[in-house]
Design a protein with these regions (language model features):
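Sec-dependent N-terminal signal peptides
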Residues: 4-14
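Interaction-mediating elements
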Residues: 19-145
Length: 145
């Protein structure tokens, strides 16, 4: 729960710090509204001719990036272990027994879906990556302060 509060605060801070909202084309808005029908708290940003929507859907904080023609390029979702595919969760629990899942970042692009999972134990933080098949790789390890 603490991780969701932190992510929500970060999301809110970034939203408040944003400048004037960009003019989002009708193509982009239509594409977004068709794909994310139940999105709430939508905030738009424009960078280098790309449009990024930050929003919540089913209580999951998400981002979607579109080009000017309304093509969805990438989505990012931030959530807890409850939304992680069960086969990946089971592999993590087996391989990293004794560590708890702090949060999940899911990246979805044309070439597939990847998961960046932050784990913790009493002494360390761990970042592991998984593909949609559940192949796990430890990418970072940090000592807690």
């Amino acid at each position: 729960m603490k991780k969701l509060i932190i992510l929500t605060c970060l999301f809110a801070t970034l939203s408040v710090a944003a400048s004037d909202p960009p003019e989002v084309s009708e193509k982009v808005l239509n594409a977004f509204n068709k794909t994310f029908v139940k999105a709430t708290e939508v905030v738009w940003h424009e960078t280098q001719n790309l449009f990024e929507a930050s929003f919540k859907q089913s209580e999951i904080i998400s981002r979607a990036i579109y080009d000017g023609n309304g093509n969805l390029l990438r989505t990012t979702r931030y959530y807890s272990q409850e939304n992680l595919p069960i086969h990946i969760l089971t592999k993590i629990q087996k391989k990293y027994a004794g560590k708890s899942i702090y949060g999940v970042t899911e990246l979805s692009m044309d070439d597939g879906v990847s998961y960046h999972i932050t784990l913790q134990d009493e002494k360390n933080w761990y970042v592991i990556e998984s593909d949609s098949w559940g192949s796990l790789e430890l990418t970072k390890k940090f000592k807690k302060a």
